[in-house]
Amino acid sequence: MGNSYAGQLKSTRFEEVLHNSIEASLRSNTLVPRPIFSQLYLEAEQQLSSLEGGSRADNEEEEEDGEGGLEPSSPPNAYQLPPPPEGCCTTDGFCQAGKDLRLVSISSEPIEVPAGFLLVGAKSPSLPDHLLVCAVDKRFLPDDNGHNALLGFSGNCVGCGKKGFCYFTEFSNHINLKLTTQPKKQKHLKYYLVRNAQGALTKGPLICWKGSEFRGRQNSTNTCSSSLFPPLESSGSLAAFPTEPVPGTNPSVPVGAQQAGPASDHPSVTTATGPAVFNGKDSPKHPQLVKSSLSALPRPSALGILPNSGPPKKRHKGWSPESKSTTDGGFIQGGGNRAKHEGTSIPCVPQAGLVGPASVTFPVVASGEPVSVPDNLLKICKAKPVIFKGHGNFPYLCGNLNDVVVSPLLYTCYQNSQSLARAYEQHGASTMQPISEETQLLLTVYYLVQLAADQVPLMEDLEQIFLRSWRESHLTEIRQYQQAPPQPFPPATSTAAPVTSAQLPWLAGLAASSCNDSVHVIECAYSLAEGLSEMFRLLIEGKLSKTNYVVIICACRNAAIDSCIAVTGKYQARILSESLLSPAEYQREVHYELVTGKVDSLGTFFSSLCPEGDIDILLDKFHQENQGHVSSSFTASSTKKTAVLDASGVPVCTSYHQEPRGVRPFQLAVAQKLLSHVCSIADSSTQNLDLGSFEKVDFLICIPPSEVTYQQTVFHVWHSGVLLELGLEKEPVTKQRAEQHVLKLDTEAQARFKAFLQNSFQNPHTLFVLIHDHAHWDLVSSAVHNIYSQSDPSVGLVDRLLNCREVKEAPNIVTLHVTSFPYALQTQHTLISPYNEIHWPISFSNGVDLYHESKKYFGLSEFIDSTLSGHSLPLLRYDSSFEAMVTALGKRFPRLHSAVIRTFVLVQHYAAAMMAVSGLPQMKNHTSVETLEITQNLLNSPKQCPCGHGLMVLLRVPCSPLAAVAYERLAHVRARLALEEHFEIILGHPSSGITVGKHFVKQLKMWQKIEDAEWRPQTYLELEGLPCILIFSGMDPHGESLPRSLRYCDLRLINSSCLVRTALEQELGLAAYFVSNDIPLEKGPKNEALESDGEKLSSTDEDEEAGTEGCFEAGSTSEQRGPVKRERSHSHDSASSSLSSRASGSVLYGESLAQPSGPPQGELTRSPPSCGPAEEGRAPGEIQRLRVSQGSTVISRHSPGLVPQPDSSLRTGRRSLQVPAAPSSQLSSSSGSSSTCAVPTANVLVLQASQCSMAKACRQPPIVFLPKLVYDMLLSTDSSGLPKSASLLPSPSVMWTSSFRPLLSKMMTSTEQSLYYRQWTVPRPSHMDYGNRAEGRVDSFHPRRLLLSGPPQIGKTGAYLQFLSILSRMLIRLTEVDVYDEEEINTSFREESEWRYLQLADPWPDLELFQKMPFDYIIHDPKYEDASLICSHPQTIKSEDRGMSRKPEDLYVRRQTARMRLSKYAAYNTYHHCEQCQQYMGFHPHYQLSESTLHVFAFSCSMLGEEVQLHFIIPKSKEHHFVFSQPGGQLESMRLPLVTDKSHEHIKSPTFTPTTGRHEHGLFNLYHAMDGANHLHVLVVKEYEMAIYKKYWPNHIMLVLPSIFNSAGVGAAHFLIKELCYHNLELERNRQEELGVKPQDVWPFIVIADDSCVMWNVADVDCAGERSREFSWSERNVSLKYIMLHIEASPNITHYALLGMRKWASKTRGREVQEPFSRCHVHDFIILNVDLTQNVQYNQNRFTCDDVDFNLRVHSAGLLLCRFNRFSVMKKQIAVGGHRSFHITSKVSDSSVAIVPSQYICAPDSKHTFLAAPAQLLLEKFLQYHSHRFFPLSLKNHSHPVLSVDCYLNLGPQISVCYVSSRPHSLNISCSDMVFSGLLLYLCDSFVGASFLKKFHFLKGATLCVICQDRNSLRQTVVRLELEDEWQFRLRDEFQTANAKEDRPLFFLTARHI
């Protein structure tokens, strides 16, 4: 008896097994023991991992193993522990000898492990958190494949050292497991134990025990256990990946599946790696599956198959169907019985993109006598029968197991369909019964009966049938659940009686009776074994030759049935069995057949079909006979009658011009959508992306390991200009620089990616965009790499790189996945938020063209629509004659893979077609019409263009070995036919570049005007115009774009058995095309795109534009010679064609007729292209006639190029060549028209010159040839209106969550389709997203990850490159601000004085010199352009020197600004939150939001006449700036430094910033501006805005103004700041005087800064010398800290009252900075001495010009104002808040009339509409725009200004004012020589007296304006000042502001001077 370890089984071992078998049978309820020999192996089920594999041990279900063979109805037995020996230890975690066995206790202790033993961890129910360490003989553990664990047990106690435990029961008692269930090693030995790098023993992978046996349909508890890779020979470094089977080792091969000795003559293809069916929610009969998230098991596209392979040894004949085959879809499984051919035992893991769906095995319990599979079954039946296990028990199979395939997938489908839908469970729908087994089977029979002979059953169809049946039978209940709240009520009685088991065989037979024996029903009396034996007998006898499906039913028992379905149809069985092979197995299978010579029989067969013997002999004979003639004949036939020549005399193609480069509207729209999504991430409250912290953009594009795709992407990057725009490179950009931004994901990628990560870490202010192009490729989890990195280091590379922790956590990396097939990234576990998906927009909406495009995209949906429309020849076709021959050969050669047969047949067809076109007409019988058409047009296309432009034929051969065979064969035939220079054959493989012959390289360089001698084409796009056959290999396209000269897309060899949506659509995406929008399609649908085009039918990833730099021209002005052929019929396939490549009309041409009318072919091909319109028939006097030749003609052997050539490319829907008067335009075709003959004789047929194939290709999409199976799949629709292909499993790496899912809808948008897949699919365990939800977070989306999806070849590369450009522009814009850039005003009025500050090099002002300088009254700040000029002496100012007053509507007209890049010393708003200033802002993630306390600060103010209470909000972090009575007590004062303090890291002056309406946009973040220096910054806010400011600036000190100032202007804030600071100065002087500090030593300065100050600059002046006034200067940005430290260090600084700086302007004149200091007005950013200005107050009522008013008050008080001219401040333009916060509106709520400034005042007691605005604001605004009404003589009369006493009010730019102060000892200008045109008395106080006013002189008629708080004060002022003596008053000259009485209006009184 053989086993897998030793040659013979020892007798003692045999006796032990026999004993266990007897014991198990005694415990069982049945009398049938398990076969002894099958017990010698515990056939491990390699299922997907259960939850216990995910470290949960609390949900373990009772498992069955070989010791307990319970039958289905047997309940689990309770286990009674024997009493322990007296005196022994019974403590949990210790053995009976008292030794500690817990892993945590002995992990570091040395443990002796005997040879052949392994340390494992046992789980005890009483110690759920601990593992007990045991030593177990590894023979009794599963082997490397999870198989072949010997039954029984042998273990040692590692605690006390006791050895020789032979029974696990005894051992479990010794280690005190204290079990309540039967002691089974499968149940309790859970983990391998391994030592980590520190040598400590740790928990390793799960032990991969087999799952429980199927316990019956009424009492099944578990169908699988944890799947695990067993340990290697070494006990260390085990990689734990408990969710995957071992790829490549074929765990699906059951016992007996290994090659049965060396006698087998071919490798079996019965390995189960095909698509699995189980997609949904698990059946309630499998609770552990539900718990362990194993509902996501692989789903089949065709009915999946599990092979029944043989046992490991030939002698071991038994096979138990419960030995399951399970492979995950993410792996390639090794050939199950190919051990002799594959010597290595290391599994080979494939590229993730190359894997196919896999079969997941469910329990298939065997019972009864075994069934022997007859010998020679495959030879007799011509196909391997595929048996689907259905319901109930399944018998053992033995014998010739290589010739049969068994699958449990139908069983899985049945189980899924018996589970209720989740949608109804939540309504309490448990009362609704699932569909019965009898109904399931009957519906299956109905489904099989209606299948056509060429159809293959699909599990999706069956699932939908079950779902519809269940819904219809429970329609009433479903409606009740949907319409009413859940209520407990009985189920409605179904009107249809249920099918009973007794009725089932008869009903099934009745259903099958109408299908001509396609379905055969076998009824069994006792077991399925009878039916299977009967079926095998009928197969051997040939009685099932017409039967495709055999249904075997055993309904002998009371309530249950047994069933299975065998697929015996040769076509169906072959497809289903081959669909199990993964891509790698498929390639290995083909390679094996090629290297072993099995395909030689095909060649012999083809030779026998050739009438003249072997085809090679015929080729050699033809070559010898025609040597030297073929080339000349083709050359002669290709000469052109007329051709446009360039300057050098070389023919030029005028019909075709190259596409202009540029970003198309669609691409720009997508780029903007991408940018919008990035901005939304940044704007979200999660702060996952801080766009404000980035200064530039960098990127890396990751692509699959395809050399062509790599070069193609590099080309796009190189020529897009993105590197220049991002500032990453400078002109000229080289290709090598572009290559640095494209990463090919191959074995060398890791090092480059590490450098990318390092770069991102080192440049935190650069935003890195990581673009994952073709993102559906390689989704394998990195855990697979961790286990099998030695076999294939590229496995899981995408996951290892793009999902690594560094990428996920880097705050400056945004990941963008780009794909045409997003389905595998749209699962329940995806990392990408649905809000971060960007879908390609639709082009039409409600008939409106949303994006005007010059070209229309022609994708898969358009191909399908054009084919279904029927109004023209189809673009999608299948070749029925080819399919028929493949089917026939499949029957003749059943042991050859169909891909081999299909490839050899197609190559044979191409070879025969080339021979037929070249002069061997008899070979037309050995090809198909389709292949002949392709070949003929390929050869003729260069002859239609003067330059030799031709078409491309794409021949898709996925299998690389077959592609090499095809290339060699076609190249050989081409060489024997002397066609090497007529078209090229190119073998394209992802791992290699493009090889093109020298002749064709020369042509390409000529067409593209390339001078580089070393140039070679590197992308398929550069092959545009080259006549060629591109043999495109590789299991999946990797994003390669194809040129516009692609005319035929031959997909007849794609692997049609692997039916998943992604695989199909990416193959068909190769044909995606752009056609000209302005030229109507000659065939195809209307130019309307489906709404769901962007989401349904997508494929490869690259743009359609950007081919080559050269200008490809096409078109012809010459005639084309060739025979006229009638067109083939309109059929979609060649079988219906009456031509069939045989007898057809032709014209006899001799060599004498082939008279050249132009340069020979060789010269034509060298003609360079030129741009020009298409021109046809330009030769004068040309006669164009049509004649159809009708009879057969003799073919001239000396003119092989002029043989009859069927032209089926004339697809205009008309028989144009059959009508003599048909217009010539009907002759044009899209890929090479029929050759016509043009000779200069009158009686010879002449046709119009054909157009260049390149020009025609621009307006016609390619023609696609498909396998019949795929063709039917695409053109048949389901109930949703979509092609059936749309309902397939979306990707092999995902699986459905439930069978109870709706179909996709045709009306679904891209977003809706994404949500559909997110709801109904989950990733397989091998998928990189599988473990995403295991992190325990509900929202596991990555915040900086986006997904761009769009159809193939539509321009996604161009879109995301454009996105990078506009993202960079936006970041630059974010780092730029619009600052006011205005020149100083009134410079011509500057006071000229002999006293100027001449010490140009002084860093600080000299006090004595400065005091001698006069004060400049003129306002130079450009923001006061509309303000009144201040006169200091009589001036003669022309009226035109002052601007015209702005209109009221121009109040906020945009001022001149400049865009400036923010420096590192800028002030920021709330949108900036970089890492450096997070703590400063109070938003640091490691800190709680800043806690603040509210403090009251009260002081008395004489100006207000009452005590003022101000509130301080002080964050805890800023309390050190203040003095409190006690910690947390009363606020006493704000700390002030000393004048004598010297510190370079501390700013002495507290900064106060009044602000309103700018909580988001105010520039309050001074961290960078202060360069990190310690400073005190206080925001001064109004009470009603306190909360919002505190929210945005939680770590800032707030000074809250009293509520009475809520409607006040900035004057009130300035007034209270100054009053507060003076009061605080007094308090600090008192406090520090107690500490011995002199009062004058306390720092008296504060800073009052505008909230829009953004940056500060210093002018560096280079003085040439004292004598010379010439100097040079430059300006640079500096920190505010630098400026403050410099100013605060000024000598005698306390003698200055006000200090300030210039306003920045780009056009600052040298004279403005030449003098370092000026005595003039200061604005915006002032340093105020609150001590010196104690008696000078701000006017708390003012809204505008309060700083000018204050400056004049300070100067008149005799104080010094100093402006540092070499410092300047930049002010940002902020469009919100500030003075814009004040709106003047009517108090009448329904008034819609606009309020103009003239309405701001009214007569007292009038019925004027009152306004809702402060009286002071109305006054100031009225005077600004309408002061001429009060001062008519002052208008433009600058020599006679208005005298303004104690105030400055803006009277508009047309009126000048003269300011004087009434205070005693004040400094005023001399007014003795001045005559004033008006007098303004504003709220004058007691200092203004009648005697004071009498000093001034006024013009006759001058006007007076007195303004007071009320009418009484107005009259009192007139009397007190004796104004009536000189001024005439009238009652009508009294006014008030337009306020209601409660708003306290201001009153005016005007008068005229007498």
Curated annotation (Swiss-Prot):
Bilayer topology: Single-pass membrane protein
Keyword presence, Transmembrane helix: yes
Record field: transmembrane: 1873-1893
InterPro entries: GREB1 (IPR028422), GREB1-like_2nd (IPR048659), GREB1-like_C (IPR046927), GREB1-like_cpSF2 (IPR048657), GREB1_N (IPR046926), TAGT (IPR049100)
Listed Pfam families: cpSF2-GREB1 (PF20692), GREB1_2nd (PF20688), GREB1_C (PF20267), GREB1_N (PF15782), TAGT (PF20691)
Sequence ranges of Acidic residues compositional bias: 59-68
Entry GO terms, CC: membrane
Chief site of localization: membrane
Stated family: Belongs to the GREB1 family.
Stated role: May play a role in estrogen-stimulated cell proliferation.
Protein's name in the database: Protein GREB1
Gene (UniProt): Greb1
